[in-house]
Amino acid sequence: MIQMAQATTGSESRRDSSNVVVETRNLSKVYRDFWGRSKKTALKPLDLDVRRGEIFGLLGPNGAGKTTTLKLLLGLIFPTSGEALVFGRAATDVSKNERIGYLPEESYLYKFLDAEETLDFYGRLFGLDPDERRRRAAALIEMVGLTRDRKRQLREYSKGMTRRIGVAQALINDPELVILDEPTSGLDPIGTREMKDLIIDLKSRGKTVIMCSHLLADVEDVCDRIAVLHQGELKELGRVEDLLRVTGVTQIQATGLSPAAAAEVKAVLERHGAGDIDIGNPRTTLEDLFLEVVRDTDCLLYTSPSPRDQRG
């Protein structure tokens, strides 16, 4: 396989507005003190759109403005300037929220309810009838891997288990748009992988997902496009593969290449003036290594091939 890098820019042309689920224009947020003076600029003027059926990542360090952006989209706080539209409606229009599922960074759930009671409660808030609540609760509990713990009170749950039931409550209304703030927080590597698989599955079901994270691997693995925020300002916007592509570098990948053949390939490249030639085995990631070890001990069924299986 030969991959030729091409120069790209972080900005992209807008698509048909009918395909846009979320749109912000010059959206900003400044927190002020008691006297109305500017205290902190949490978000500088932001222009972006999220397209139907994609997984969109908001990436940035702590304090970059990611959670502020999500709260503005949900209408939980009001912008200082600009506008945010969700499904073509103003973000401050609460009627849009019936089509949204939201997992906050910290899940504030009733700790004396069990998983079934929790989902029944949120189902009531959306006006679901009893049979539909039971059906959806059972399916979601199985989806997030809490079937064995469905009768335990949430106060007995670990943080990872709490995140799982939090995702389930975000899906109880079968939303079109799912907003996840740090969805892998508190999860071990196995739980993280399962959470990322769940997010990808949501896309396959036709959902639009906005995922907020400061973990690079999480965003790289699941997102179609990303926006990189830093100190409240949009720094990059585009498709993941475009932003990660290194220009001016050609990558050649082959299996079953003998040392002699590798040396011959290197000699050909040198004759054509190639510089900084590196021919060797590709590296796997720590996550893949860990998951493979667990899989080999029958603790995890992981069907996709590991990069380590392709080593020469």
Predicted regions, residues:
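Conserved ABC transporter NBD signature motif
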Residues: G82-E98
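Conserved small/polar residues in nucleotide/adenosyl-binding loops
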Residues: Y302-P307
